[in-house]
Design a protein with these regions (language model features):
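Classical eukaryotic N-terminal signal peptides for Sec-dependent ER targeting/secretion
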Residues: 1-10
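Conserved NAD+-utilizing ADP-ribose enzyme module
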Residues: 13-31, 36-43, 49-57, 69-187
Length: 187
């Protein structure tokens, strides 16, 4: 699946924010919250179609710079997503398992109705919660991902810093479990 043009524009806007940022992120209380690979055009504010819709619409990230390695074009840049820690800590975080308690599939559906119902059952709002899930690749279910929904990205909680070379990325992996998302992770 491909992201909508709205989400593509959202990614481009986030990327443009990081390019214009003159302040060292370490001095603003920012933390690394995820990574992804993106074409150079996205890193510099041009519209681009991205992949994915497993747990909803938005910007998909992985905990490390290598999370989307197999899905990215060879010349894709390495992007690090950062957020102000105080603001990020206030954002609700939820795991989205593959199936709900009624054994109904939630991943890769035409709409987000079941996911929204699941998030609401955890007493959170779907449009203001970060979503986490396993990123299945065949039988390997050890990878994880985070989805930044459009409403959160629109509020400019996040900045993106992109690097042409992998070795230029100094940020280490993020540990999603340390943020204690609500809900069932699944397997």
């Amino acid at each position: 699946m491909h992201f909508s043009s709205f989400t593509s524009l959202l990614v481009a806007t986030l990327a443009a924010c990081s390019v214009a940022s003159p302040v060292d992120v370490g001095k603003r209380g920012e933390i690394t919250v995820g990574s992804r690979r993106a074409d150079k055009g996205v890193c510099f504010g041009h519209d681009h179609v991205m992949w994915g819709a497993q747990i909803g619409k938005g910007v998909y990230t992985s905990p490390s710079r290598d999370g989307y390695e197999a899905l990215a074009a060879p010349d894709a840049w390495y992007c690090v997503i950062k957020a102000d820690q105080a603001a990020f800590d206030k954002i609700p975080k939820v795991w989205i398992p593959e199936k709900n308690k009624h054994n109904q599939r939630m991943w890769n559906q035409k709409d987000e109705k079941r996911i929204d119902e699941y998030i609401e059952s955890l007493h959170e709002h779907p449009s203001s919660s970060l979503r986490f899930s396993i990123m299945p690749h065949g039988r390997d279910r050890s990878r994880q991902q985070m989805l930044i929904v459009p409403e959160l990205a629109d509020k400019k909680h996040f900045t993106i810093h992109c690097y042409e070379k992998k070795e230029d990325v100094k940020e280490g992996a993020v540990h999603y479990d340390s943020w204690h998302p609500k809900g069932e992770k699944g397997n």
